[in-house]
Design a protein with these regions (language model features):
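Juxta-kinase regulatory segment immediately upstream of eukaryotic protein kinase catalytic domains
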Residues: 2-63
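ATP-binding glycine-rich loop module of kinase domains
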Residues: 55, 59-117
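Short beta-strand micro-motifs within the conserved protein kinase catalytic domain, predominantly
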Residues: 127-138
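Structural motif in protein kinase domains
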Residues: 145-160
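Activation segment signature within eukaryotic-like protein kinase domains
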Residues: 175-176
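Catalytic-loop of the protein kinase fold
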Residues: 183-198, 203
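C-lobe/activation-segment region of protein kinase-like
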Residues: 210-289
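A conserved short helix/loop substructure at the end of the activation segment
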Residues: 297-309
Length: 324
């Protein structure tokens, strides 16, 4: 068994950190049940492997950039210096709605551990593994992905929409299609992502691939267990085609002629202030691509049953971009 004495831990930590950044003695944690007690400069020992905690991860959704996620620890592997994201057990339940449909949701560490095994080696997913702590909590140890999340990446493209759509969007669509194929791979393996949203895609700065993170949610619905993932994919596509959210209130103020042509049926089925029928706003969007978006509009009468159908239409839309 590895020597994990205080002296040995300090020697390991000094390979990666300045002495002034380290405590005189480390507090060692082998039971993560109370994740609030796992704090900065604690050493997590999991499966006889030491990780130095460097802080809590933060929630970046909807601009909440400093909302800590106390069950997710930014850490360093003391044996090789690599950055890790260590996810501790946090249980919660809630309901979500997509139009008239209600989904029941739970957060499941076991499910995420299972999915990590399924996607091992897949370039469009975060990579990691699970271990049990001394109280048999399922802890997930994730390789840190260097890059920015998808909203940050898109907001960094400083072009007007037409220039963005014809210049940047074709390559973005290609990368996005790879993420849809990745979700299709999950579904073929009878798994779901469970929390498909744009800030759960990281643009890997090394490979430029779009990579999925955070798949510890399970959504239940008696008709289609994959439906929530598909709705999330549609919301991301609408966001990418628009080069950001196209908000009705903003159109009312800035483009009143366009706003007056919009109806309730043109709006996003989940976010009722966002336009899904983007061809009414940007007429150069192809009919083929816009027809995909309309599957996620309030006026739709047909939903995608599976990611295979969605992929087929996306590939046709990609071809329509090349033709124009």
């Amino acid at each position: 068994m590895m020597d994990l004495s205080q002296r040995r831990l300090r020697d390991l930590a000094l390979r990666w950190f300045d002495p002034v950044d380290l405590p005189g003695n480390f507090r060692i944690c082998t039971d993560t049940t109370d994740f609030f007690r796992v704090d900065y400069n604690d050493v997590l020992i999991l499966n006889n492997h030491p990780y130095l905690v460097r802080g809590n991860a933060k929630e970046g959704r909807f601009g909440i950039d400093d909302e800590p996620k106390y069950w997710v620890k930014r850490s360093t592997d003391l044996l090789d210096g690599s950055k890790k994201v260590i996810k501790l057990v946090f249980n919660e339940r809630f309901q979500a709605r997509v139009g008239p449909i209600t989904f029941n949701c739970i957060r499941s560490p076991m499910k995420e551990a299972r999915v990590l095994s399924v996607v091992k080696g897949h370039p469009n997913f975060m990579q990691g593994f699970s271990v049990a702590d001394d109280s048999r909590n399922v802890v997930r140890i994730i390789d840190y992905i260097y890059g920015e999340n998808l909203p940050t990446f898109i907001s960094g493209i400083k072009k007007d929409h037409e220039e963005y759509f014809h210049g940047s969007f074709p390559s973005i669509l290609r990368a996005y299609i790879e993420t849809v194929k990745a979700i299709h791979f999950l579904h073929e393996n009878e798994e779901t992502h469970g929390d498909v949203r744009r800030d759960h895609i990281i643009v890997d700065e090394t490979t430029t691939r779009f990579r999925w993170i955070d798949f510890d949610f399970i959504f239940y619905h008696h008709e289609n267990r994959f439906g929530y993932d598909i709705c999330g994919l549609g919301n991301i596509l609408i966001y990418l085609v628009g080069g950001g959210d196209v908000i009705a209130q903003r159109l009312r103020d800035e483009r009143p002629d366009v706003f007056q042509r919009l109806t309730r049926e043109d709006m996003n089925i989940i976010f009722l202030n966002r336009v899904a029928n983007l061809k009414k706003v940007f007429p150069y969007i192809s009919d083929t691509l816009n027809s995909v978006l309309l599957h996620f509009a309030m006026g739709t009468e047909t939903f995608y049953d599976d990611t295979g159908q969605f992929l087929d239409d996306l590939l046709k839309a990609k071809s329509s971009l090349q033709e124009t």
